[in-house]
From Swiss-Prot:
This is Anaphase-promoting complex subunit 4. Pfam families: ANAPC4, ANAPC4_WD40. Its main location: nucleus. Component of the anaphase promoting complex/cyclosome (APC/C), a cell cycle-regulated E3 ubiquitin-protein ligase complex that controls progression through mitosis and the G1 phase of the cell cycle. The APC/C complex controls several key steps in the cell cycle by mediating ubiquitination and subsequent degradation of target proteins such as cyclins. The APC/C complex is required for the female gametophyte development and is involved in several aspect of development by controlling cell division and cell elongation. Involved in the control of endoreduplication. One of its GO terms (biological process) is cell division. GO terms for cellular component: anaphase-promoting complex; nucleus. The gene is APC4. It comes from the Eukaryota. Belongs to the APC4 family. It comes from Arabidopsis thaliana (Mouse-ear cress).
């Protein structure tokens, strides 16, 4: 019986294989949804796919540019995609619809990490603290960008389903505070609240890297640095950055008896102090909520102006094309008059010229007049509708929201520390009011112009009827005075176009002295401090307002950026120039685990960061085919200002005959390794295995006292390498040679492995529920 039992135990295969299916393309990036059994993948030709756990494909999209990174929003409802040109695209999980494009970088976005606040929404006093957005009390739902006329369904980027998703993306009132971290190829790291409002930026080349164990005031710089991975802790207090580069400008004289790490390319780990995000998360939440909604509404105004400009330009093009032939006929008949003079002559009762008669009766005709009338006056009504439904409501809500921010800025004790500047917000608030005045003026000008065009066309119809000796008693009447004004000032002028376009320097709108005097009188009664704003066009005023917003929002961005600093540098190992592994091919994984003895005090002892990576071959002669794991534990931020109280690491030797393809930190401090067998027959499909290592059982060695710029961190571990044995770990054989990436979901307990021969294998990493229940009992 005992022999049979032992045989059964040996036959138990860990990690149930869900399926092994062929795929038509090779995958370069794969990430599981944190909340659902959904897998997002990026193909080698940069198509983004979303599959269910059963491998049913939900959608495929192509951004049109090379995809370099991908991550999920913490709630699993959106995907952030980093592109080679520095763009970050946010897509809806339901249909892949593009929600937002951001451009915080100028070069390829190589890594993304989106983390939300792990704490409950309570303030320092323990009171429930969720910021209430009061806008919905006073305003209807925010307007959407108008559709460009003439587009069929599917052509516009403002589709209904996408608009609903975008509204949800911006509605952050009851969502947990979260931050998207993005790193690019040039060493820039950007921080965006809710993934849409940029709140900070640092460059690892410009950081002062502390070395307090040698000299309290010493620091150094990284040169030729490249970021590989970033990870933000769940309390938002710490950012871990894996990067490569050369340490220079160090003020410490190296010890001659040890290897100097300066001027050598190496793999480094930086621990950044981002505690400002936790300390001021409620204030930042409020600012980001208002500012991101203002930015959305600004885009509504921009789209409205663009649509209006195009519509009016098309209508005026139709008008001028129809009436251009009159000028040609006047010249052909040897006349020296202008079209306006010909029309005024006809209006005055003079004999009609042959040119004008030919134009009205033969070229234009009653049908032509009505067609132009419909185009111009119909467009005028459409423009009025765009203003009433989109532009004006957006400007009014912006005015309310910027006023809310101005009110917050007066609470200096809480908001001055994050850069909310009252003076800049006062200016932005006034500029919003100026835009609303410009909108009212535009509506008055548009109404007047449309009325005069309509009056002109009514007169033309009556004139054509008269010339053709047809009855015209039933036709609309016209106003002769308005007609004279139109022919003198509007026939070859376009005040609507002037207001919709940006004015050049020196092309300001002329304002009479009486109007300027009224504006100055209003100043004495608390009116606008600027008196010359009416000389600007509507488009110019919008640009002026947008510029003031950027200045006001730049202050929190700059302030927060300055408060992010480096508190620890770990020079892990050198990188030989001759190595076959580039930084982008070194398997790495970063994660944070909650401490068991934590008292839930953020920024002190809440989370331990784990860093796992494959040690590149040729790094050290004594270390080959090894996996490095380091963990940092910051016990008390008050006592240890610039570092951790504990830094530990361990080296794992990969079993003989295997090489590491990829790795991923898993839940409960576990590490999943994907290993390829080295002695595979070239004719076969190869063989690999997936191994789960319990990091909690490993003998970590403290390296906090040995950190020095004269020695690489891994050198202390050469004599204490832990050998991984296949029989001692959970191992699942894979009947294929495998390639990166290894996609592991800690929340769902699944892993996806990709084979060289284009196959996808999905495994369930969790044990049977029956076993778990029995264990609990």
């Amino acid at each position: 019986m005992s022999e049979m039992a032992s045989d059964e135990e040996e036959n138990i295969i860990p990690f149930q294989l869900q399926f092994d299916k062929p795929i038509p393309f090779q995958i370069k990036i794969a990430e599981w949804n944190p909340e659902k059994d959904l897998l997002a993948m990026v193909t080698e030709d940069s198509k983004i796919l979303l599959h269910r756990f059963n491998w049913q494909r939900l959608w495929t999209i192509s951004p049109g540019k090379p995809v370099t990174s991908l991550c999920w929003r913490p709630d699993g409802k959106a995907i952030a995609v980093g592109l080679e040109d520095g763009t970050i695209s946010l897509h809806d999980v339901e249909n892949g619809k593009l929600l937002r494009n951001l451009k915080p970088h100028d070069v390829a976005v190589v890594c993304l990490n989106w983390e939300e606040d792990g704490q409950s929404n309570t303030d320092e006093s323990g009171n429930f603290s969720v910021y209430e957005d009061r806008t919905s009390r006073f305003f209807p739902p925010a307007p959407r960008p108008p559709k460009m006329p003439g587009l069929v369904a599917g052509d516009s980027s403002f589709m209904d389903d996408g608009e609903d998703s975008l509204a949800e993306l911006s509605n952050t009132s009851f969502r947990k505070f979260n931050i998207l971290c993005t790193g690019d190829r040039d060493g820039n790291i950007c921080f965006s609240i809710f993934g849409i409002f940029q709140i900070g930026k640092i460059n690892i080349h410009e950081l002062s890297l502390p070395v307090p164990h040698l000299d309290e005031h010493a620091s150094c710089k990284l040169f030729n640095a490249s970021i590989y991975k970033v990870a933000l802790s769940k309390d938002l207090c710490r950012l871990v950055v894996m990067c490569t580069g050369e340490l220079k400008d160090c003020d410490i004289k190296p010890r001659e008896e040890k290897i100097n790490v300066q001027d050598l390319p190496g793999l480094h780990c930086l621990a950044m102090d981002t505690s400002i995000f936790w300390k001021r998360k409620y204030e930042l939440h409020q600012v980001a909520q208002q500012a991101s909604n203002i930015e959305d509404l600004t885009e509504v105004i921009r789209a409205s102006l663009s649509v209006m400009n195009k519509q009016w330009a098309d209508a005026m093009k139709t008008f001028h094309e129809k009436f251009h032939s009159l000028s040609t006929l006047i010249i052909d008949n040897g006349l020296e008059s202008s079209p306006q003079e010909e029309f005024l002559s006809l209006l005055g009762g003079a004999r009609i010229s042959p040119a004008l008669n030919q134009f009205l009766v033969n070229s234009l005709g009653e049908v032509g007049v009505k067609r132009v009338l419909k185009s111009v006056c119909g467009t005028g009504k459409e423009l009025q509708q765009v203003v009433l439904d989109h532009l004006q409501p957006a400007a009014e809500i912006i005015g309310f929201r910027i006023g809310e921010l101005r009110g917050l800025s007066r609470w200096r004790a809480r908001y001055q520390g994050i850069g909310l500047d009252e003076m800049l917000l006062n200016e932005a608030t006034e500029n919003t009011g100026l835009l609303l005045v410009q909108v009212q003026r535009f509506m008055m000008v548009l109404s007047s112009v449309v009325q005069q065009f309509s009056n002109f066309f009514n007169w033309l119809v009556r004139s054509i009827k008269y010339l053709m000796q047809e009855p015209n008693d039933q036709l609309l009447s016209y106003n002769s005075e308005l007609l004279v004004v139109f022919l003198k000032f509007l026939y070859d002028q376009d005040p609507v176009k002037d207001l919709l376009e940006l004015s050049e320097a020196g092309d300001d709108i002329e304002i009479d002295l009486k109007t300027i005097g009224r504006v100055k009188e209003l100043l004495q009664f608390g009116g606008f401090s600027e008196c010359d704003f009416l000389q600007r066009t509507l488009a110019k005023e919008f640009q002026h307002m947008e510029s003031s917003f950027k200045m006001a929002f730049q202050m929190p961005f700059t302030t927060i950026s300055r408060k992010i600093s480096c508190m620890k540098l770990l020079p892990l190992c050198p990188l030989q120039l001759s190595t076959t592994q580039t930084p982008t091919t070194i398997p790495m994984s970063l994660s944070f685990y909650k401490n068991e003895l934590s008292d839930d005090t953020p920024c002190q002892s809440g989370y331990t960061d784990y860093i796992s990576f494959q040690v590149p071959d040729e790094t050290f002669p004594e270390i080959s085919n090894c996996i490095g794991i380091a963990k940092g534990y910051k016990q008390n931020s008050n006592n240890e200002k610039n570092g951790y109280t504990s830094l530990e690491a361990v080296l794992l030797s990969v079993p003989n005959g295997y090489t590491c393809v990829d790795l991923s930190l898993y839940k409960d401090k576990e590490l999943v390794l994907l290993l390829n067998k080295t002695n595979t027959d070239s004719e076969g499909s190869g063989e690999a295995c997936m191994m789960v290592v319990q990091t909690g059982d490993l003998a970590f060695i403290s390296i906090s006292g040995s950190s020095s710029l004269n020695q690489w961190e891994l050198e202390d571990l050469k004599g204490s390498i832990v050998n991984l044995e296949m029989e001692n770990e959970k191992v699942r054989k894979v009947p294929h040679s495998v390639i990166a990436p290894l996609a592991v979901s800690a929340s769902r307990g699944v892993a996806c492995v990709f084979a060289e021969r284009r196959r996808a294998l999905v495994y369930i990493l969790e044990e049977d529920e029956d076993e778990e229940i029995s264990d609990e009992k």
